[in-house]
Amino acid sequence: MKTRQARELGQRVAALVQAGQTDQAYALLAPTLAERTSFRMLGLVGEAVGAGPLETATTFLEHVAAAGSMGGWVVIGKALGEQLERDPGGVFVRCRAFIIAADVWYGTDILGERVPGPALVANLTPTLALLAPWREDANRWVRRSVGVAVHFWAKRSRGKAEHTAQAETLLAFVEPMFEEWEIDAVKGVGWGLKTLGRHYPDLVADWLAQQVVQRQRRHRKLTLRKALTFLSDEQRTRATG
């Protein structure tokens, strides 16, 4: 599928969604979801849907979620991302519900990289307030998505010095999750720390030293292993004592 085709499909699907014709909209989209369509093209469809009225878009996205296709989570994630400026609180409520509905790692990661991740990049402080309850959510996938969002922010930061203070804020934010024990959630937390360590290695080394050496906090070996991935030998020694 070419970009123009994806945009045209998105416009057609969005028009049906806005008209309240949910079944017809999904029938139009379903063949594309069944094919090997790139996430970028699916994202264009999602953006078109998300640009429309919230109520009809939500009804359609719930229909997409019920089908459970991998590509469907991309459409949902990009649609929610398109709604962030209009309804940030509502988007986070809906995103959490979709993460729980997905109940699988790739659905969680797709949504985490398209909703809370970009929200952190766009507006860090208000987003942290919305994301804070997810750190201790009863659902492991919701907790995992916090780490995915931090990974996305770190990737976009590219290690620029001007973002160092924000990186410090994010390390403080994920500190309560260092003792996460459920392995699916641990992988998300570790991913976030790994990418922060890639771009801000000294910062992460000092932070790990506080958790591991000074406070001797209980943690999964996987969490620490991922966090150490991009650190130098000297930084690893500093981090682990």
Regions found by a protein language model. Give the residues of each.
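Alpha-helical scaffold domains
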Residues: M1-G241
